[in-house]
């Protein structure tokens, strides 16, 4: 059975979810001082849900809507992704925060993983996407807990036919054939580096190409070597589908990776080698991803909040 919905089915699902969220928010727009429709969506990556602590707790307090309550939304099943929409204000700017994202490897279709963006676009107001992720470092200069501002991407599943815009086009949102040569907004990237300097963050902030793979397995040595040869600086299992759909909707995009582990590109141990490299060397785990997310989380939170003050 095809997982591709026709335009009417997509629109029906989007409209139903948007109506549910709007009904929850409407009383707050009417009765809460300074509660405004969000202009920016922030998506929190693995272990980076602490960004929500930067939401104003009063004037106005945040409004939380669990994914599982919203028609058509899927619940995140991955540790480090709580699964809530949070509407509020960050550094004086109205925002909606996805505390936990959806992944294809959880069994979701690409329409389902990017569904929140379609819904928020239908509701209006949101025009910016700030997306964060935990990624493996491919570039030899990158170390665990470094940061990388994404300026381009490699969409490996997309090149093989698994693309978020595959199927009937939603003409009201964007064009059938979308140009992505400048998917990551230059002015927002400049703003990120400006705030990094102003905050005097000691953690390195690189600029590079993110490679999207479907997961859930971490990369083999040969795959990591291939990605490096193709020009990838980091690799992860998210972000690119959301970026593509946001650009399809005409949003500006800023994307930030936290390098939580370094990928192994050396050849595997040989059965003919009398002193092989230990097999455990360089092996990535999700626990490592979450732990390094905690280590760097304060810098990520402060950086995102500083950027929000300019939006």
Curated annotation (Swiss-Prot):
Its EC number is 2.4.2.1. The modification Phosphoserine is found at residue 275. One of its GO terms (biological process) is guanosine catabolic process. Pfam families: PNP_UDP_1. One of its GO terms (molecular function) is nicotinamide riboside hydrolase activity. InterPro entries: Nucleoside_phosphorylase_d, Nucleoside_phosphorylase_sf, Purine_phosphorylase, Purine_phosphorylase-2_CS. GO terms for cellular component: cytoplasm. A purine D-ribonucleoside binds at residues 219, 261. Phosphate binds at residues 46, 81, 101-103, 134, 238. Pathway: Purine metabolism; purine nucleoside salvage. The modification N-acetylserine is found at residue 2. SUPFAM superfamilies: Purine and uridine phosphorylases. Keywords: Acetylation, Glycosyltransferase, Phosphoprotein, Transferase. It catalyses: a purine D-ribonucleoside + phosphate = a purine nucleobase + alpha-D-ribose 1-phosphate. The purine nucleoside phosphorylases catalyze the phosphorolytic breakdown of the N-glycosidic bond in the beta-(deoxy)ribonucleoside molecules, with the formation of the corresponding free purine bases and pentose-1-phosphate. Cleaves guanosine and inosine. Belongs to the PNP/MTAP phosphorylase family. Present with 1630 molecules/cell in log phase SD medium. This is Purine nucleoside phosphorylase.
């Amino acid at each position: 059975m095809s997982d591709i919905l026709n335009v009417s089915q997509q629109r029906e699902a989007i409209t139903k979810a948007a109506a549910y969220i709007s009904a929850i928010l409407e009383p707050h727009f009417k009765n809460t001082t300074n509660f405004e429709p969000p202009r920016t969506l922030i998506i929190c990556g693995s272990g980076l849900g602490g960004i929500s602590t930067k939401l104003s707790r009063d004037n106005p307090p945040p409004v939380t809507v669990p994914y599982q309550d919203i028609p058509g939304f899927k619940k995140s099943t991955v540790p480090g992704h709580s699964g809530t929409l949070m509407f509020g204000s960050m550094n004086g700017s109205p925002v909606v925060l996805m505390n936990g994202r959806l992944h294809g490897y959880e069994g979701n279709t690409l329409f389902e993983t990017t569904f929140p963006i379609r819904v928020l676009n239908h509701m209006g107001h949101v025009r910016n996407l700030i997306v964060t992720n935990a990624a493996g470092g491919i570039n030899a200069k990158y170390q665990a807990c470094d940061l990388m501002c994404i300026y381009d991407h490699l969409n490996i599943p997309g090149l093989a036919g698994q693309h978020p815009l595959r199927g009937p086009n939603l003409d009201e949102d964007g064009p059938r054939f979308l140009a992505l040569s400048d998917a990551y907004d230059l002015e927002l990237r400049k703003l990120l580096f400006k705030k990094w300097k102003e905050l005097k963050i000691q953690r390195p902030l690189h600029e590079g190409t993110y490679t999207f793979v479907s997961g859930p397995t971490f990369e083999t040595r040969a795959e990591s070597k291939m990605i490096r040869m193709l020009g990838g600086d980091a690799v992860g299992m998210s972000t690119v589908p959301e970026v593509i759909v946001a650009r399809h909707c005409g949003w500006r995009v800023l994307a930030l990776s936290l390098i939580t582990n370094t990928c192994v590109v050396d050849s595997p141990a040989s059965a003919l080698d009398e002193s092989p490299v230990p097999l455990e060397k360089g092996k990535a785990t999700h626990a490592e991803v979450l732990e390094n997310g905690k280590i760097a989380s304060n810098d990520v939170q402060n950086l995102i909040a500083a950027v929000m003050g300019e939006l």
